[in-house]
Amino acid sequence: MSDIMSNFSWLYGKPVATGKLKQLPEHFIVKEILGFEFTGSGEHLMVKIRKTGENTKYVANELAKFCGVKSKNVSWAGLKDRHAVTEQWLSVQVANSDELSFAKFEATHPGVEILEVTRHNKKLRPGDLQGNQFQVIATEVTDIEDVLARLEKVKLTGVPNYFGSQRFGHEGNNVNEARRWGRDNVRTRDNSKRSFYLSAARSWIFNHIVSQRITEGYFSQPVDGDILLDRNDRIVNENVTSEESIQKIQNGELSITAALAGDNQLPTTGTALTLEQPHLDAEPDLMALIRGNRMRHERRAIELHPENLTWSAEGDTLTLNFSLTSGSFATVIVRELLQEIEVERTYSSND
């Protein structure tokens, strides 16, 4: 199988080490961080689940059946990996839940545990997700000393804030389908599918821009015309190439950004514009899809700094612990450490 992420540059060079991820679901543990408290009352039943080897949408649909509501009445803050152990909240719009016995649900769904149940006055939405805590275990790791040296660099400098391979689908099929939609001017009322391909299109272009900045030596170095964001994701209007700005970038107070393409003109100028515009021009079909859906231009930081990063190595097994803000991908951290050896998996029909 081809690696779609091989299209993009590595910050620390292509790793020499190899290793396996997710040999077992418990080798990839994700715990959701919402960042707010529930009211304890309201029309929405909040159910905290721990799922193993199941995807979020399947569990949500099963929970809807169990609660006697339609699937559209169950929502979440974020979709979680299937081949993993993940903890997250689901909200169910149901008036009376007194007669529900979640022990029965668990008995018929061995891959799901119900950890906590409460109520809230609003349903969960994707914007509610603050971040995720991760524990990632890589096995059969070669050249462990090189991996440990790279981890020190990651802790100091971070990694490219790429969108991970899951955004692009198996062998890039989501990107290819997005191109077809743009080329054929496909129209649909399926908002979920439209959002899916739009995200793939914008992510693909963003990754290429970041990759070029790495290749040309502008990853941590601002250029004239760059757009900077502060820690609250607000655009900062100042001399981006000044010593003060460079120092703030190095301190993590400001972030260099790249384009999430839209139908409006890029706000970058000068050298920054020459780094970005060619990647939009190189993908006319993706841009046709983006413009046809009136997506507005946005900015995304090009650096990703994992929080509370720790690690340990025992033999050829590496354990990583860290937290990421919403929208960031754990796999792009591992990508800078080792080349992943594909693990053969057999899935049930619940996907």
UniProtKB/Swiss-Prot annotation:
Enzyme class: isomerase
GO MF, one annotated term: tRNA pseudouridine(13) synthase activity
EC numbers on record: 5.4.99.27
Keywords linked to the UniProt accession: Isomerase, tRNA processing
Domain TRUD: start-end pairs: 158-304
Annotated GO CC locations: cytosol
Record-linked InterPro entries: PsdUridine_synth_cat_dom_sf, PsdUridine_synth_TruD, PsdUridine_synth_TruD_CS, PsdUridine_synth_TruD_insert, TruD_catalytic, TruD_insert_sf, TruD_pseudoU_synthase
GO biological process, one term: tRNA pseudouridine synthesis
Domain of life: Bacteria
Residues annotated as catalytic: 81 (nucleophile)
Keyword Transferase (UniProt): no
SUPFAM superfamilies for this protein: Pseudouridine synthase
Catalytic activity field: uridine(13) in tRNA = pseudouridine(13) in tRNA
A Pfam family this chain is assigned to: TruD
Similarity section: Belongs to the pseudouridine synthase TruD family.
Role noted for this protein: Responsible for synthesis of pseudouridine from uracil-13 in transfer RNAs.
HAMAP family: TruD
NCBIfam families reported in the protein's UniProt record: PRK00984.1-4
Protein name (record): tRNA pseudouridine synthase D
Species per Swiss-Prot/TrEMBL record: Aliivibrio fischeri (strain MJ11) (Vibrio fischeri)
Name of the encoding gene: truD
